[in-house]
Amino acid sequence: MKLAYWMYAGPAHIGTLRIASSFKKVHAIMHAPLGDDYFNVMRSMLERDRDFTPVTASVVDRHVLARGSQEKVVENITRKDREESPDLVILTPTCTSSILQEDLQNFVSRASIETEADVLLADVNHYRVNELQAGDRTLEQIVTFYMEKAKSNNQVLTQKTKTPSVNIIGAVSLGFHNQHDIAELKRLFQDLDIQINQIIPENASVQDLKKLPSAWFNFIPYRETGLMTARYLEKEFNMPYVDITPMGIVQTAACIRSIQQLVNALGAAVDYEKYIDEQTRFISQSAWFSRSIDCQNLTGKKAIVFGDATHAAAITRILHQEMGIHVAWCGTYCKYDEEWFKDQVQEFCDEVIVSDDHGLIGDLIAKTEPAAIFGTQMERHIGKRLNIPCGVISSPVHIQNFPLSYRPFLGYEGTNQIADLVYNSFTLGMEDHLLEIFGGHDTTEALSIGISAVDSINWSEEAQKELNKIPGFVRGKVKRNTEKFARDCSKNLITLEVMYEAKEKVSS
């Protein structure tokens, strides 16, 4: 266990609660001490939703520690069953309450005798998996439970629809631009004349899960959530799935061709090549934009990419293949998916980083000195400290990346959004310099060699004046190089002489 003040992926119970709060008429009971029960506040703040978060904390306090948890947990489950009339109640401990080593399955068995709702214990090892893995496992557990229940009652709908149809698996509460992506996928499948059978878990009913096998195939837009469910459905009901993320012109075309091949193999006769060509040339603005003089100004610019496996891999491909931007390194915090990630991106960047240590990532960014960063909320903070622009392309994110306006990352409309994000993330020409000349621009203090450096270096008045004469678009780099030289030489005050010495050293 590691003490950290920042985690890219949260603890396991957050993943379980995200899945539970995505379904309709599902209530989660969190067996946790005060301090672990922040999910309600976080979801209420971030998710653009009118409804209350369907999560109740069964607080572990001194009374519980003295008498045991069973009575309180069972009472909370039965009370919520009476008050909310849910279809399903999920009980999840947290990594803290797991220390008590209680037989929670026994609590669930006891409570289910008294409830109308089904009651499940989240089957997750809270010490071995993170938020993303736990969410994936919880979704599979719920689908498996209701499919097995329907099978035993002979209620599974295995009769395929007459026309091609799809289940979209992985629309989850608190996902990165998730609602917009799903809206774009609906539009895409409508254009392809593929009817949508089910979208799970967002706004889905557990009572409708028995209809999943009616679809021709399953579609998994994000690797982080849904793959385990798709593999279960493939194994049990022989349902194929497509897991190519349609992000960027190239990958969207690859995804559509994969769908075409699959539905034709299942008995349809479709040809989507004309649709791909029309969308690429006339609907998506990013194809011609990538050949414009504006985008050519970005050719060879250095960038770094960091995020979850799905988004980091897709953005790296887009920067390299579609925009000609040099990706110095790309990375992910999804250490469990390292093999797939490396296979996807190693051709498109100089180096692949797999780490969940934000300090290491910050130091690497400072050392690389890219022209732009594409990362999470943490990389945005790092970029502000280093005076390097950052485009946010992946969770974890803050409120500004739960926009009210339509901003998908998937599909052809998503290509326009990504092109805007990439182009606007780079500092254009002498923008900083002009802004400083005409006022209204706050200069951000930049750190020197690494984000984790804590000691400070002072500048003399003459040296600061000399630094201010340097054009803004290179000033940050000059400052960092000078401070690095001063630090290496154990100098705490930068004078004009130190500046010139640093310049000579860098030039040589």
From Swiss-Prot:
Binding of [4Fe-4S] cluster, residues: D36
Active site per the UniProt annotation: D294 (proton donor)
List of residues binding substrate: G429, M430
Broad class of the protein's primary localization: plastid
UniProt cross-references to Pfam families, sorted A to Z: Oxidored_nitro, PCP_red
Claim: Cytoplasm is one of the keywords in the record: no
SUPFAM superfamilies named in the record: Helical backbone' metal receptor (SSF53807)
Pathway annotation: Porphyrin-containing compound metabolism; chlorophyll biosynthesis (light-independent)
Catalytic activity annotation: chlorophyllide a + oxidized 2[4Fe-4S]-[ferredoxin] + 2 ADP + 2 phosphate = protochlorophyllide a + reduced 2[4Fe-4S]-[ferredoxin] + 2 ATP + 2 H2O
Cofactor remark: Binds 1 [4Fe-4S] cluster per heterodimer. The cluster is bound at the heterodimer interface by residues from both subunits.
CDD domains noted in UniProt: Pchlide_reductase_B (cd01981)
A Gene Ontology biological process term: photosynthesis, dark reaction
Top-level class of the enzyme under EC nomenclature: oxidoreductase
Domain of life: Eukaryota
A GO CC term attached to the entry: chloroplast
Molecular-function GO term, any one: ATP binding
Subcellular location: Plastid, Chloroplast
Keyword annotations of the record: 4Fe-4S, ATP-binding, Chlorophyll biosynthesis, Chloroplast, Iron, Iron-sulfur, Metal-binding, Nucleotide-binding, Oxidoreductase, Photosynthesis, Plastid
EC number in record: 1.3.7.7
Cofactor(s) it depends on: [4Fe-4S] cluster
Subunit and partners: Protochlorophyllide reductase is composed of three subunits; ChlL, ChlN and ChlB. Forms a heterotetramer of two ChlB and two ChlN subunits.
Family stated for the protein in its record: Belongs to the ChlB/BchB/BchZ family.
Function: Component of the dark-operative protochlorophyllide reductase (DPOR) that uses Mg-ATP and reduced ferredoxin to reduce ring D of protochlorophyllide (Pchlide) to form chlorophyllide a (Chlide). This reaction is light-independent. The NB-protein (ChlN-ChlB) is the catalytic component of the complex.
Protein name: Light-independent protochlorophyllide reductase subunit B
Organism: Pyropia yezoensis (Susabi-nori)
Gene this chain is encoded by: chlB
